[in-house]
């Protein structure tokens, strides 16, 4: 279901001068020993970003997952870009989270970087649900204007493709425009905050249970700490 999203993101990254990087051995792809499920991941070197990861899980009609996180260079205090899309085919259920993930919740910081996401939040009302995500504190590393939906086929087929394209454009625009604005957070603190994001997320990642059920505990633990959130590896 999410191949078009994957292709669009990879096309954008390539046009921006991105080049693929090697993943830790054995983590670029895994096939389930119990089913036809397969998970593939990519790591990109993109100008202006220190790390951009992408993951696609195909478990047929039962589950489809698309996930990506972009980490700006430490010289930029820009928000991270986070995408989580899950489709449960048997239940015809969509869970979608698209966010510019703030390093801090300071008003000046939010005013500086979130006008584009605020506009999208208004433009796509069926993706600005008020329901709080259950696994995370919305006041940490999430914005008040994230596009969030627990919906069905209508949102998956109609709203989400348009919202995803607009979301990517808004994030690229944020990055391009903000490069000319001096960061207010020094690089060493940006690194510290990005590391804390990894640690925080690894402790709460709801997808870890899904990966474990499909690909086993050992592989999924490596995937969590070595690829998804590598700064968490020293805090296991």
UniProtKB/Swiss-Prot annotation:
GO terms for biological process: phytochromobilin biosynthetic process. It catalyses: 15,16-dihydrobiliverdin + oxidized 2[4Fe-4S]-[ferredoxin] = biliverdin IXalpha + reduced 2[4Fe-4S]-[ferredoxin] + 2 H(+). GO terms for molecular function: 15,16-dihydrobiliverdin:ferredoxin oxidoreductase activity; cobalt ion binding. The keyword S-adenosyl-L-methionine does not apply. Keywords: Oxidoreductase. It comes from the Bacteria. Its EC number is 1.3.7.2. The keyword ATP-binding does not apply. HAMAP family: PebA. Catalyzes the two-electron reduction of biliverdin IX-alpha at the C15 methine bridge. Belongs to the HY2 family. This is 15,16-dihydrobiliverdin:ferredoxin oxidoreductase. The gene is pebA.
